[in-house]
Amino acid sequence: MQDFRFPELDALLTMQDLKPEDCYTRELNPLSSPLVHVKLPSETHAKFLSQRGILVKGVYEVWGHGHTYAALVESVDAFAEKDTVVSDASLSWKIQVDAFGLKLSMEEQTARRENFRHVLPFAGPVEMKNPALTFLILEDIGVDQQKTTPDRIFFLRALAGGEKNRGRGGARDLVDAQTLKRREYIGPTSMDAEMALIMCNMALVQPGSLVIDPFVGTGSVLVPCTTFGGICFGTDIDSRVLHGKAGKSIKSNFDQYKLRVPDLIRADNSRSPLRCPHYFDAVVCDPPYGIRAGARKSGRYVDYISLLFHSFSTRLCAGQLDRAATAAGVCFLRPETN
């Protein structure tokens, strides 16, 4: 799980026709910091990371950085693009202070803001609730809780997300909005909303993408795919889960979120009835690996994981075939075993 932020970030960049290796470099120890420095061609590209990124908690423009506040203030002062923003009297603003690895008192936060009084003489008014501009002084202490001196300090302008994200328009709002706790129709194998959203991103689902879940169950994996504009299909061998019970079914979930209901087919994936080579853009599923639910089939025994790759890789569009083994064209989960 701790490495999911990089594959998802790679997928988000790929959706924008950007090469991940040209945009950022992975840290040697990715657990040491929650921050990733990404170079992007425009604010539109940056905001997309928040609009689709489930593991992206905030997107910021770097105005300055340093190991000390003296170095940080000097770096901000040298940032030429700030002048137009600072001199605009119509732009309201606020400055937040946060630290990863350390809790700061209100007095400490105020003292840190005072460092920028002279280099950032904003012409606009201060507005704490809904400012036009939100800035963040961020100290990166690291995972060593014994330290009190930051390894890095940043002065950032918020572009998207940030704070608690809820209600701020980013994709992380969907984690709460589509939680299973309030889902109309669920079962023991329904995929957690956050995980399903991540899978959707890693499968590169975009508006108009043709997506299939060969183990659709209650449709939990296809909910985010449809949310992001995918045209979805699902198959399952169990007719009971497809039809639902007590007046609730897969259709109930999609009606709940006002989404297009996927086309559903009862099918045995060991003998798939689908005859549509190079048709789908993505296969996104959670196979029945036998822990919460076992695999059901008619006919002879087969290795269903191998069958899934063999069968559905031939049904992916030609441009998606090279991603079938990298969880980008085909994305599914398997349990980790020791």
Per-range role (PLM):
Residues 12, 71-82, 115-119, 253:
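Residues that form generic nucleotide/phosphate-binding pockets
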